Amino acid sequence: MKDMSLVNSKVLLVGSARGIGFSVLEHLLQAGAQVMAADCEWQLLLEQSESLLGRYPDQLTLKKLDLAEPEAVREQVNQWAEQVAGFDHLVCCAGILHVAPLHEMPMEQVSSIFTVNAFGVLACMQGVASSMKARQQGSMVIIGSNAANTPRMSIGAYGASKAALHMLVKCIGMELAPYGIRCNLVSPGSTRTAMQQQLWTEQYGEAQVIAGDAAQFRLGIPLNKIAEPADIAQAVLFLLSDNAGHITLHDLRVDGGATLDH
């Protein structure tokens, strides 16, 4: 088996200031990648990345990017790709969540979720695609969700946006496969992040997520634990690496068996 070294690979990482994205950033730098890390939370990105900039001054560049404006995102990402003579890899971890019953959620919130989670991520993929096509190589790994395949109460818009994203990734992956470009998804289940904690209350937290809840029509987690951000990051690095050289259009679910692989 080949190692998962990404030495000198140029990676655009979108959504890198917290949670899964920040763990992916740490793993990419440890693997030797040259990373352009972008996030809409600029101040948080600066604060979180301070120690990484000290340890990897020649590998890390920080940028601000807001996926709420997809047309601007596509143009900006394309410009960055031109500046670095093309990215080898794109990783998108960005996403937003509003928690409310879908039958009551304001359309403004539904629209904002789709704009960021589906259209903004698509804009990133479009932004790197032309330079990858010209070089006849590249890979994209997009963070999806196991909620794309399994209905969940109070996060219906989020799940629907991720379902749309999954199909966008697979379709663009099919279009780009003849050019040697691989496009894959990593779909986390419950993971120890701030977004996950938005769903927890005093009565419903980590233990209940693991055990499952019939009233919420939720199975538990067969592995009896929630994921850590590093679990997701390691899956991302595998799909970026040469070990996954014949894998594309794939959804790698990292949820401890919570959706029984359906």
Curated annotation (Swiss-Prot):
Q: Which residues form the signal peptide?
A: none
The GO terms describing molecular function are:
2,3-dihydro-2,3-dihydroxybenzoate dehydrogenase activity; oxidoreductase activity, acting on the CH-OH group of donors, NAD or NADP as acceptor
Instruction: Kindly state which keywords UniProt assigns to this record, in alphabetical order.
Output: NAD, Oxidoreductase
* Stated name of the protein: Vibriobactin-specific 2,3-dihydro-2,3-dihydroxybenzoate dehydrogenase
Q: What is this protein's function?
A: Involved in an early step of the biosynthesis of the catechol siderophore vibriobactin. Vibriobactin is a chelating compound involved in transporting iron from the bacterial environment into the cell cytoplasm.
Reactions catalysed according to its record: (2S,3S)-2,3-dihydroxy-2,3-dihydrobenzoate + NAD(+) = 2,3-dihydroxybenzoate + NADH + H(+)
- Keyword Oxidoreductase among UniProt keywords: yes
Q: Where is the active site?
A: 158 (proton acceptor)
Q: Which Gene3D superfamilies match?
A: NAD(P)-binding Rossmann-like Domain
Q: What EC number(s) does the entry state?
A: 1.3.1.28
InterPro entries, per this entry? DHB_DH, NAD(P)-bd_dom_sf, Sc_DH/Rdtase_CS, SDR_fam, SDR_superfamily_enzyme
Q: Which GO terms describe its biological process?
A: siderophore biosynthetic process; vibriobactin biosynthetic process
What residues does NAD(+) bind to?
12-36
Q: Which family does it belong to?
A: Belongs to the short-chain dehydrogenases/reductases (SDR) family.
Pathway listed for it is: Siderophore biosynthesis; vibriobactin biosynthesis
Binding of substrate, residues: 145
Domain of life of the native organism = Bacteria
Q: Which NCBIfam families match?
A: dhbA_paeA, PRK08220.1
Q: Does the keyword Phosphoprotein apply?
A: no
The record's annotation in CDD domains points to: DH-DHB-DH_SDR_c
